[in-house]
Curated annotation (Swiss-Prot):
Record keyword Membrane present: yes
Subcellular compartments: Cell inner membrane
Principal localisation: membrane
Membership in a protein family: Belongs to the dicarboxylate/amino acid:cation symporter (DAACS) (TC 2.A.23) family.
Protein name per UniProt: Serine/threonine transporter SstT
Its job: Involved in the import of serine and threonine into the cell, with the concomitant import of sodium (symport system).
Protein topology in the membrane: Multi-pass membrane protein
UniProt lineage: Bacteria, Pseudomonadati, Campylobacterota, Epsilonproteobacteria, Campylobacterales
Family annotation (Gene3D superfamilies): Sodium:dicarboxylate symporter (1.10.3860.10)
């Protein structure tokens, strides 16, 4: 009987389960503060599990990605689209930073006080702080959650192991798969954690706490829509000198729609390849560019990382300098490229960006937990942006005469 319940839960729709957790959490938070405090233990366990796995995930994900990917045989078109993917992701993260400055959001978090120590603001202080984090002992970086140190050692290790044997690379691929399975297991428990977090949030902060979540979600979705209809439109016009919107709407209708519901760029690869074929793009090109885009073209993830990191800074009262904002755009860009194929990957990389502002690791993980609460909508919109942009950029880089008469 018990095993059947577990199997039924494991096979259930995670979105539906999270929605049920949110509703039950609100009801418990309103009706009983005592039960909410008990339920909060589930939230604490969930965030603790995320805190434990996140450093290892970032390290092994980036190291494996660098040491196993090979673009040396790629032609000029592939090199162009790699550049376009990275530039598009950077512009998306820069838009997210600007959106936060114009429409800052502060979260209502239980037990979070205004920061007594602001982040460094002078250029010399910023680079000194970054330098010491970068050269941190790798074991200490993993244990303390120093994500800049983790990122540095992961990149260094990936480059050093670039030319190791295929057998050695396979070991890292297998370890990476093992870590991803652990992450998927933890994320599958998200409904219980979210139930506890929502119940405690409603009991402690009332409707004000939930309202801050809604404001954050609106900012995220609005920024992603701006990237879709303004930034991507400008990129297409720059490349083609033609009206970008017919192609954008084709990509939205035939790619973003499916990606919104699958919530997986990888699962949407066959849909995107079929669309590229209908558009008249060379199979030799889109056969490489579409899977590649599902790996490194992560504009939506960059928006999520940048906005949630700056929201964490706003919440604790840290003022962000222009230099820090620029550095965040760069960090969000490359962090987003490592978020593919991981359930909640963009959320788990938020502590990496938060480390730039000396934000306490516990606070960063509370923001990550809130990300899972709003992720029911945020992750769908993020994936729709990521996946549809793969086709959009492939089309303009292909130099083929495109077929716009697609039904």
């Amino acid at each position: 009987m018990f095993s059947k319940i577990i199997q039924s839960y494991a096979k259930g729709n995670l979105i539906v389960q999270i929605c049920i957790g949110i509703v039950l959490g609100i009801l418990i938070g309103i009706s009983s503060k005592e039960i909410s405090e008990i339920a909060n233990l589930l939230g604490i366990l969930f965030t603790s599990a995320l805190k434990a796995i996140a450093p290892m995930l970032v390290f092994i994900l980036i190291l494996t990605s660098i040491c196993t990917k090979d673009f040396s045989q790629s032609g000029a078109k592939i090199k162009n689209i790699i550049i376009l993917y990275i530039v598009g992701t950077f512009l998306a993260s820069a838009c997210a930073v600007l959106a936060n400055f114009f429409f800052p959001v502060k979260l209502v978090l239980d037990g979070v006080q205004t920061a007594t120590n602001s982040s460094p603001t002078h250029m010399s202080e910023i680079f000194k702080d970054l330098l010491f984090k970068i050269v941190d002992n790798p074991i200490n970086a993993l244990s303390s959650g120093n994500y800049l140190g983790i990122l540095t050692w992961a990149i260094a290790g990936g480059i050093a192991l670039k030319h190791c044997s295929n057998e050695a690379k396979q070991v890292f691929i297998d370890i990476n798969e093992g870590v991803l399975k652990i992450v998927k297991f933890i994320v599958k428990l998200a409904p219980f954690g979210i139930f506890g977090l929502v119940a405690n949030s409603v009991a402690q902060t009332g409707a004000q706490g939930l309202l801050s979540y809604v404001k954050l979600l609106i900012l995220l979705v609005a920024t992603m829509l701006f990237v879709t209809f303004v930034i991507n439109a400008l990129i297409v016009f720059f490349y083609t000198r033609k009206n970008p919107f017919p192609l954008i709407f084709i990509c939205l209708r035939h790619s973003a729609f499916f990606a919104f519901f699958t919530r997986s760029s990888a699962a949407n690869i066959p849909v995107n390849m079929a669309l590229c074929a209908k558009l008249g793009i060379d199979k030799e090109f889109y056969g490489i560019s579409i899977p590649l885009g599902a790996t490194i073209n992560m504009a939506g993830a960059a928006v999520t990382i940048a906005i949630l990191s700056l929201t964490a800074a706003n919440t604790v009262g840290i003022e962000i300098s222009l230099l820090q904002a620029f550095l965040l755009s760069i960090i969000a860009t490359f962090a987003a490229c490592g978020a593919s194929g991981v359930a909640g990957g963009s959320l788990l990389l938020i502590p990496l960006a938060c480390s730039l502002f000396n934000i306490d690791y516990d606070i960063a993980m509370k923001v990550v937990a809130i990300g899972f609460i709003i992720g029911v909508i945020q992750d769908s919109v993020e994936t729709a942006l990521n996946s549809s942009t793969d086709v959009l950029f492939t089309a303009i880089c292909s130099k083929n005469e495109l077929n716009y008469n697609i039904k």
